[in-house]
UniProtKB/Swiss-Prot annotation:
5-phospho-alpha-D-ribose 1-diphosphate binds at residues 26, 72-73, 98-99, 102, 104, 123-131. It comes from Herminiimonas arsenicoxydans. Orotate binds at residues 34-35, 127, 155. It catalyses: orotidine 5'-phosphate + diphosphate = orotate + 5-phospho-alpha-D-ribose 1-diphosphate. It is an enzyme of class 2 (transferase). CDD domains: PRTases_typeI. Pathway: Pyrimidine metabolism; UMP biosynthesis via de novo pathway; UMP from orotate: step 1/2. The keyword Nucleus does not apply. Signal peptide: none annotated. This is Orotate phosphoribosyltransferase.
Amino acid sequence: MNNLRQEFIKFSVDTGVLRFGEFVTKAGRTSPYFFNAGLFNQGGTLARLADFYAQTLIDSGVEFDMLFGPAYKGITLASATAVALANKGRDVPFAFNRKEAKDHGEGGTMVGAKLQGRVVIIDDVISAGTSVRESVDMIRAAGATPCAVLIALDRMERSGADDALSAYSAVQEVSNTYGMPVISIGNLSDLFEYLSNAGADSEQAQYRDAVSAYRKRYGVT
């Protein structure tokens, strides 16, 4: 058992970011759980989340020089993670992009430190991989090297329509396409372990079978 990963799942449940029930995903699937990182919307919870990101990145052993947060959620995540890393003795620069180019002041679409060296892309989840693809293009265009993607939760789900499921998840496809690791604080296996360890009379225990069935249908190995 990885205590950090289990602590993160519990933290997400306790803050209401990770909920159980019936939810329709972007892919049109009915999922027994829903993870909404936008609900990490208070200073204290954001600080704790950033600490999870920072510690996970340190523990991964990935060598990096700076952070990049794609607009919009990635902006806050990269900024907060940079603060958390500095508090752990690793002071690194960070940058993020605007959705719309600015034609006055410093101009352009990039904000923060100059993109250079080995860059870690920070986001909440990977659904279709669009945000990562755009980030990789921007980083490479600046002459820097994307070296890893760091996300909060890996759903470990096979991509594609129900009648044409891929053998790979969106996370695996990103890793294979760009030849770099995708690191997650927690994943579906951690979530299932959390439910399996929940007491029989706990609120979460009732969702164990639903998550197990969902993982059997859509999960990757």
